[in-house]
Curated annotation (Swiss-Prot):
Its EC number is 6.3.4.5. ATP binds at A8, Y9, S10, G11, G12, L13, D14, T15, S16, G117. Belongs to the argininosuccinate synthase family. Type 1 subfamily. This is Argininosuccinate synthase.
Amino acid sequence: MSERVILAYSGGLDTSVAISWIGKETGREVVAVAIDLGQGGEDMEVVRQRALDCGAVEAVVVDARDEFAEGYCLPTILNNALYMDRYPLVSAISRPLIVKHLVEAAREHGGGIVAHGCTGKGNDQVRFEVGFASLAPDLEVLAPVRDYAWTREKAIAFAEENAIPINVTKRSPFSIDQNVWGRAVETGFLEHLWNAPTKDVYSYTEDPTVNWNTPDEVIVGFERGMPVSIDGNAVTMLQAIEELNRRAGAQGVGRLDVVEDRLVGIKSREIYEAPGAMVLITAHAELEHVTLERELARFKRHTDQRWAELVYDGLWYSPLKTALESFVAKTQEHVSGEIRLVLHGGHIAVNGRRSAESLYDFNLATYDEGDTFDQSAAKGFVYVHGLSSKLSARRDLQ
């Protein structure tokens, strides 16, 4: 028997075509592996059956929802990770988990080749292949969409010619990737930067004006940086994301229209929906404002940005990322408490904070009676703090 190919299967156009194409062009058997990351939509059994209908000799579905939430979404929260200060890494954090399960499937099903359906213009090819190189450098990688220059038109034509069951047309050519952390939409008319997104682009969020008269106030509780409660009710990491997806999505929260710098050197336009992610990152960052010491908070802003860049760039398994996470774990020792937020009209507004670990001292901060701040010490502090600037200015005026 020829060596099997283990394919990362999404159920979409490119990977459905890839099953049939790999079988016809290489003569190898294909094992399709679909990972349930809480993407919703089609039943995963339907996806599994489609893989078999497309020619896979085996089709495996892995329920990785809790693993994804706890091992991949949670670190994104702890690092307040927003690539280019906007994108909460919806697709980027899912790829290393998919890689992990593909490697496991390759060992279990006798596969020496792993395959993905990424193009040569995107970031995901890097995320997959750097991940494979990190976890299983002995595996060969096959990338038919990239290496054989498939276009969407060619893929659609191949699907039609070979009766591949996939719901995509030239009239509706969106490329969509989604999981419980969010949803990404690209291509089609969105490639023209002046074109506004139409209603059919969105799925996770309502129009921000729909529930204009009914804002939603929510309290998110944290322990050592991890979300543990919603409105006082204990939740798992997955439950926290799912509930906030529903509630924030109903308020139109989490819609992002982004032109981002891809790893491959081009700019691309993406429409993201990440209601739960944006609420959790906002709440966590606010709690850090209350509980982290000033110099630590300042430095962590730099590491947060670097962590997001590493993950976006496909370096999930890099030594630097591992080292940064050890640092971040230390920073979270006192990040416990509750943040109250109002979700309304597409916006998130923090309006309350409480924590037993708070560094906010009311008696030092108040301007009313009971003020314990020794203002007499301020004059000397100001003199010393500004001395270098004073000396520099005096020199420059000479």
